[in-house]
Every structure is written in C-alpha cells, then in structure tokens.
Amino acid sequence: AEHKAADGLFVYDSKNVKDLQIGDYVKVNGTISEYYGLTELNASSVTKLSDKVEAPKASTVAFPKTDTERESLESMLIAPQGDYTVSDVYNTNKYGEIGLAASNKPFLNPTVKGLKGDAETGAAYQAELDRIEAEGVYLDDGSSRNFLDTKYPDNADTPLPYLSNDQPVRVGEKVTFTKPVVLDYRNSAWRFQPTERLTGDNADAQPVTFTSTRTDTPDLAAVGGDIRLATFNVLNYFSTTADETGCSTSNAYTDRDGNPVTAKNCDVRGAWDKANMERQRAKIVKAINNLGADVVSLEEIENSAKAASSVPASFKGERRDYALSTLVDALNEQAGEGTWAYVPSPQTVPDLDVEDVIRTAFIYKPAKVATVGETRILTDSDAFNGKNGY
C-alpha cells in the first residue's frame, strides 16, 4: 500500500525503557526477529539522545483490507479514516479490547447468512467470513493485562478501559477516532493500540469516542397489539450448587481473592455455594423484571432431569423443568404472584443420553399472552444439531 507514514518498529525491552517518555529521541541497538507474526527489535541497549527532531506524523489512511497492506503499516502511527463500528465486546472485561468492523455495520455470525458448503447458502456464509477477514480489527488498551487474573492485585483498582457507568459500549455503535493509534499485530489479530496504556488515570489518552445508535423508544409502526419479546442468557443457572455435590474447591472458578464462585469440571455448573447462587439469582431476577418484556427466551438454564441436581418429591412438574420453576418463583416473589409462568416441557422428550445439562426455555406473562397447544422439542433439523458443526 502506498502511504507516507513514518516507518515504525516495535521494540521489545523490559529493562531500559522505564525512564523514557513519548517524544524522547533514542538510539536502540538489538536484534530483529519475528515474534508470532510481529516484527520486533529485541533491544540490547537503549540510549536517550539530546538531538531535537521532529515528531513523526500520523498517516491518514483507510483501514488496510489485506495482510500485505497491513504489513506495510505494521507498528506505524496512523489516523484511521472511514467508518468503524463496534462489533464485539466479548473480551472487553477480560483484556480491555473491543472488536471493530471497518464499515458502518457490525459483523454477523456467518451461519446467520448461510451454511458452510451448502449449495444455496454457502456463498453467503463465505462472503461474511471474507468480510470479517477484510474489515476486522481490535481496539486495544495498550496492555496485555488480563483483568480477571488474580495474580495482579491492582486489577480491582484499575478501571476497565473505554467503559464507564454513563458510557456503555454496545455492538452497533459508531466509533470516531480522535487521536492517532499504532497498528499492531499480536495474539493472532490486527489491533489499534493507543500511544500509551489506558489506566483510568489518563482518560485523555483514549483515542476514540462512541456514538450510541440506540433509541430510548424504538419507532414502531402501528400494530394491533403491543407484545415485547426478549432473550436472556442466565449463564448456567442451576438449582444445585457445586459444594452440595461434593466438588473439590480445586475445581472452581475463583474471584480476585481466591474464593470459589462458580463450578468448574464438577457434576453441576453454575454457582459454587448458596450465597453465590442467591447472588446470581438476584441479578437475573432484577434484570428480567426490568426488561419490560412479556415473553423471554432463556438460554443456559439447568436441565434438571439430566444434571446432578436434587429434585424434591413435592415438585409435580416435569423433572427437567425444576430449575426453571425456581427461577419463575423468584421472579414472581419480586414482581407479584402470577406475574410470570413458564412453558412446561412436553411429555415426549429426547432420551437423556442425547440431552445436555443445560437447555433453553420460555417464560411469559399470562396477563399478556397465552400458550396454544403442547410444546415440542425440535431435534429433527440439522440447524439444531451441534454435532453437524453449525
């Protein structure tokens, strides 16, 4: 790619750069190497020079769409031009990174467009994969810090980059670059790095602003009714805790202080003990009751017939619905008796050996909607069969 960017090179050095600041003019001796796709200079010495030189200017370029173009700008200071949209916030709370699409729309899972190898939809599937490859880039925080790692005691005191209570970052938001960034390659992905690590104490170093595209009240055409639908992942809501099944504390996800919080490699998933179960349930109940929805599709709720959970003899419903019933009871305790009901499982269900310990489910408000007929569990379609790879 043709550009006028000042040449840049990543310098790896853990000893000699602590006293340097942005703008210093230095002489670096070392050895060039390729480290997992990033060209870097492994410094043996760094000398600060007294000469006065002009600071490098950022190159104003559109996002390079090919690896060849990106390589020509690797480690260089650029001022990104064109449209950028938030497309992924999955690892923002862990690594302080935000996935961007270099276009005016976020990416879709390619299987939304089609199925790999399918005669009719395979081309659409591949087209979305190609778009992700051409337009995908991460906005990083200038650090490799894992905010969930307990070996960093200052994690609890370091605010997550880019986020604040009054400025959430949502998929679909427009991204505007206000400061230059460095085009970087690490962890198998191209990234925009700020010129210094974002710590919460240097908010002015944040190189972007976000513009929300969400309206407070969506504009809806006049319809004959007003039913609100929502979906909510309860993230392994189980009716039995890990400590009740005798799971070892070595098989637990822990908080920053090393206390067990959720199950890992246990006979159940979800909360570690009663206190964490109540904390999980309280968050779910508050969130769902504040959705304003009339029908909610739930994901990752316990299949009580399959999981190693205790279903009391007093429960008169289908065994697989027990955890679901406890969540509905908790919702009604806060919202009022009878506010919520769940759609019961059908009498005919798949064999337990082909079911998972988690499932999907529907809850609804009887005052707004009613069920018609018996439910069905769809198992005869490739689209619902994970063993087929989609």
Residue ranges and their predicted role:
Residues 28-37, 46-51, 83, 87, ...:
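Sec-exported extracytoplasmic/periplasmic mature domains
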Residues 200-361:
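N-terminal, active-site-proximal structural segment of metallo-dependent hydrolase catalytic domains
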Residues 339-390:
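Extracytoplasmic mature domains of secreted/periplasmic and thylakoid-lumen proteins
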Residues 1-262, 280-281, 369, 377-390:
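Extended non-catalytic accessory segments flanking core domains
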